[in-house]
């Protein structure tokens, strides 16, 4: 079990409230999104992994926002491709 110093994580993010927001978002990603942790898991809970990632500067609000945007774009692109295939659109303008 890795030791997490919450204060280090707070210092990275700036305040405890934002830290909790970011850590919970990241923990949810790890839990539901099948995302691979950026640090060794060491049998830690998702929340602990999230805090460790933040503490090491691997996860910030900007990084999370950018990742979510990218995922949405990929999702939309995949859906668009699927709809195009079903609609039998053979004229792809990319």
From Swiss-Prot:
GO terms for cellular component: DNA-directed RNA polymerase complex. Its EC number is 2.7.7.6. Gene3D superfamilies: 3.90.940.10. Keywords: DNA-directed RNA polymerase, Nucleotidyltransferase, Transcription, Transferase. It holds the Pfam family RNA_pol_Rpb6. It comes from the Bacteria. InterPro entries: DNA-dir_RNA_pol_omega, Pol_omega/Rpo6/RPB6, RPB6/omega-like_sf. GO terms for molecular function: DNA binding; DNA-directed RNA polymerase activity. GO terms for biological process: DNA-templated transcription. It catalyses: RNA(n) + a ribonucleoside 5'-triphosphate = RNA(n+1) + diphosphate. NCBIfam families: rpoZ. Promotes RNA polymerase assembly. Latches the N- and C-terminal regions of the beta' subunit thereby facilitating its interaction with the beta and alpha subunits. Belongs to the RNA polymerase subunit omega family. The RNAP catalytic core consists of 2 alpha, 1 beta, 1 beta' and 1 omega subunit. When a sigma factor is associated with the core the holoenzyme is formed, which can initiate transcription. This is DNA-directed RNA polymerase subunit omega. It comes from Photobacterium profundum (strain SS9).
